[in-house]
A protein has these predicted regions:
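Conserved N-terminal beta-strand and adjoining loop/helix that marks the start
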Residues: 1-19, 40-41
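Short connector loops at helix/strand junctions that flank enzyme active sites
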Residues: 4, 31, 36, 63, ...
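Short, charged/polar surface micro-motifs in flexible loops or helix N-caps
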Residues: 12-16, 25, 42, 90-95
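Conserved Nudix-box catalytic region and its N-terminal flanking loop in Nudix hydrolases
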Residues: 17-57
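A short coil-to-beta-strand element that immediately follows conserved catalytic motifs
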Residues: 62-70
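Active-site-adjacent beta-strand/loop module that shapes the phosphate/pyrophosphate-binding cleft
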Residues: 74-95, 105, 109, 122-128
Length: 129
């Protein structure tokens, strides 16, 4: 089966995750959801190269030691099957910038489940703890 290859990363600081509130793009399947940062592979990229690029593009931050946490496969009609490579990171440098896809906010880990997140994300948040 062919999968759309993507990455997702949760940066961690002071008991919080950096969350992206997707409110800026029109026709966004994630509109008004809170998600981590990440995106689709570009040609020739592997998961690590993709997540490094996406985090820098969306946040202005450069990860120094991302931790590969696993793979999550999504099957949800009408979208193509997606293979998401999940990362967390506690070591990063730089100054956070505005994101063209939404608003970035540090959210206490215990409050994330109360946000409008995808139902499937709730499963792996429990596993990340």
């Amino acid at each position: 089966m062919d999968f759309l290859q993507t990455t997702l990363c949760y940066l961690e600081k002071d008991g919080c995750y950096l969350m992206l509130h997707r409110v800026k793009k029109k026709n966004d399947a994630n509109h008004d959801k809170w998600v981590g940062v990440g995106g689709k592979f570009e040609p020739g990229e592997d998961a690590l190269a993709c997540v490094m690029r996406e985090v820098t593009e969306e946040t202005g931050l450069t990860m120094q030691a991302p931790a590969y946490r696993g793979i999550v496969d999504f099957y949800c009609t009408p979208w193509p099957a997606e293979r998401m490579h999940l990362y967390t990171c506690t070591q990063f440098a730089g100054t956070m910038t505005d994101c063209s896809e939404g608003t970035l906010e540090w959210v206490p880990k215990q409050a994330v489940q109360d946000l409008p997140i995808w139902q499937g994300d709730k499963i792996f948040f429990d596993l990340l703890a």
